[in-house]
């Protein structure tokens, strides 16, 4: 074999070795990616199962309140569901659960047909209290039901279609509104800002009303209207309530470096059951307390 032939053979061997090295490296890289993908998928499945466990716990709190002697005919902040955010360690992960009465928010569905002057005025006062530009959700186009009436809002996110609300405004407004069909504002759970949007009230009176609220809530809207703090003030009973049917569970789950937030809307039914109305994933919340 000549020197030229030996050189060609050596180059061929080097090329084959390089090719084999590239193939093996690619196989190892793909294997690592598959392992990472499998690990991430497994973590997501575990997070989802942990979130559902938290949702089941939230349902149990509402079920326990439903089965009490008075049930949830009166919904107030002294009940099990309102005990505040709860954190648990389970199966190597952590869950934070927060239950909220959606009846404590302004019900956007009361604005749908544009003829509800009390709700419209209250909404405008709420916007002013929050420092937001006035706007009218009734101007949004809505599909009609079989009865020819506008269907309820699917979600508060429909307000994105309003030109008066930018991203910052929507973030500001979102915690104060909900779409709860024909639900009224629950006087037993509503914060001062919601009460201050009622006729003839301001933040000073509203804060005093929150402080004076009975631990087990008002027995009726009339009992709220007749309290001494409202003497000489005319608050319309329309659209007000002392009970709620719709609640929201916000479930934050952590497993190692992985995070998940599940938001579940719940309905307490007259037959004593708690129904899951819908679930949605949201951006993970604040870190867990140490």
Where are each of the predicted segments found?
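Compositionally biased linear targeting/interaction segments
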Residues: 2-290
């Amino acid at each position: 074999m000549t020197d030229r032939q030996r050189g060609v053979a050596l180059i061929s061997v080097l090329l084959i070795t390089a090719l084999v090295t590239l193939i093996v490296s690619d196989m190892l890289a793909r294997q690592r990616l598959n392992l990472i993908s499998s690990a991430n998928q497994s973590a997501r499945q575990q997070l989802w199962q942990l979130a559902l466990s938290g949702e089941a716990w939230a349902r149990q709190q509402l079920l326990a309140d439903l089965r009490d002697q008075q049930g949830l005919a009166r919904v107030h902040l002294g009940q099990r569901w309102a005990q505040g955010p709860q954190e648990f360690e389970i199966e190597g992960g952590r869950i934070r659960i927060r239950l909220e009465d959606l009846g404590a928010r302004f019900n956007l569905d009361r604005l749908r047909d544009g003829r509800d002057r009390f709700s419209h005025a209250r909404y405008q006062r709420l916007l002013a209290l929050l420092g937001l530009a006035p706007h009218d959700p009734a101007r949004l186009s809505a599909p009609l039901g079989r009865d020819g009436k506008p269907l309820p809002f699917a979600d508060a996110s429909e307000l994105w279609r309003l030109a008066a609300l930018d991203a910052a405004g929507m973030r500001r407004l979102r915690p104060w509104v909900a779409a709860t069909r024909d639900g009224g504002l629950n006087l037993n759970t509503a914060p001062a800002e919601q009460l201050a949007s009622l006729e003839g009230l301001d933040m000073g009176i509203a804060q005093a009303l929150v402080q004076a609220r009975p631990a087990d809530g008002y027995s009726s809207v009339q009992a709220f209207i007749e309290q001494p703090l409202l003497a000489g003030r005319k608050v319309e009973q329309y659209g007000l309530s002392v009970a709620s049917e719709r609640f929201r569970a916000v479930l934050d789950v952590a497993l190692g470096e992985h995070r998940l937030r599940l938001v579940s809307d719940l309905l307490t039914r007259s037959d004593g059951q708690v129904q899951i109305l819908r679930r949605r994933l949201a951006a993970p919340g604040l870190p867990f307390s140490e």
